């Protein structure tokens, strides 16, 4: 029964994401978590620079944007899966850019840790409770560049030239990315320069992935993992 379940499971997974796209997709998530939590574990007690501007201080706290801030994880999952369903070369070009961006984030998080000023949460309403919960589980660090903004912009860049993706969904993805940018500002999770840094880093890394041959390095490594996955599936 277990063998039959695993066969059905793999058939279902490969039906969503081709075998060559599975490793880069999963590793993207794993590496992102390692960068974010690892840099926090290393630099959590270090001095953090506050780079918020006067404009940041004047912008209001709008907790309703937490809907976008939390909901964007669904947006990320959907679009990264759409990217992983592309042709092999495009998959590795995109995820090469994705990995490079996280390497840059890790360097910046350790070389120049940043923080910001968060509002005092004193109410007992649903939005106050949600904001308080977010602040309690997500320390004000690893802010520049904003990974929320970086990933959201990647979500748009990764599908904008896909002919199989409807134009309306490309527009939706662009709109959602911009809403995520706004959510990071109005929930006081990030400041303006964090947003700009995330978008610029995503754009630069995406160009590197598309215009250089760096993807071959990642693709060779990914191919070895892909073969091991296929061998494992064959023995199920």
Predicted features along the sequence, with ranges:
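Interfacial helix-loop-helix junctions of multi-pass membrane proteins
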Residues: 119, 123, 140-144, 179-207
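Hydrophobic, membrane-inserted alpha-helices
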Residues: 75-79, 152-157, 175-183
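Membrane-embedded alpha-helical segments of multi-pass membrane proteins
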Residues: 30, 68-75, 147-151, 196-200
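N-terminal transmembrane-helix/juxtamembrane module of multi-pass inner/ER membrane proteins
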Residues: 2-76, 122, 131, 233
């Amino acid at each position: 029964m277990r063998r039959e379940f695993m066969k059905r499971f793999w058939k279902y997974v490969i039906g969503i994401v081709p075998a060559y796209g599975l490793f880069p997709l999963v590793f993207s998530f794993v590496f992102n978590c390692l960068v974010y939590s690892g840099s926090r574990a290393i630099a959590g007690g270090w001095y953090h620079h506050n780079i918020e501007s006067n404009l940041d201080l004047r912008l209001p706290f709008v907790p309703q944007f937490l809907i976008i801030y939390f909901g964007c994880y669904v947006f990320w999952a959907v679009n990264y899966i759409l990217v992983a369903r592309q042709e092999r070369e495009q998959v590795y070009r995109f995820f090469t850019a994705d990995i490079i961006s996280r390497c840059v984030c890790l360097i910046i998080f350790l070389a120049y840790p940043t923080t910001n000023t968060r509002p005092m949460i004193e109410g007992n309403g649903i939005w106050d409770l949600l904001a308080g919960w977010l602040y309690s589980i997500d320390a004000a660090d690893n802010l520049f560049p904003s990974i929320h903004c970086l990933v959201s912009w990647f979500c748009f860049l990764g599908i904008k030239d896909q002919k199989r993706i409807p134009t309306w969904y490309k527009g939706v993805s662009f709109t959602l990315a911009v809403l995520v940018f706004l959510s990071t500002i109005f929930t006081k999770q990030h400041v303006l320069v964090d947003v700009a840094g995330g978008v610029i880093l995503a754009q630069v890394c995406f160009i590197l992935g598309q215009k250089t041959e760096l993807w071959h390095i990642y693709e060779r490594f990914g191919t070895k993992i892909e073969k091991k996955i296929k061998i494992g599936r064959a023995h199920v």
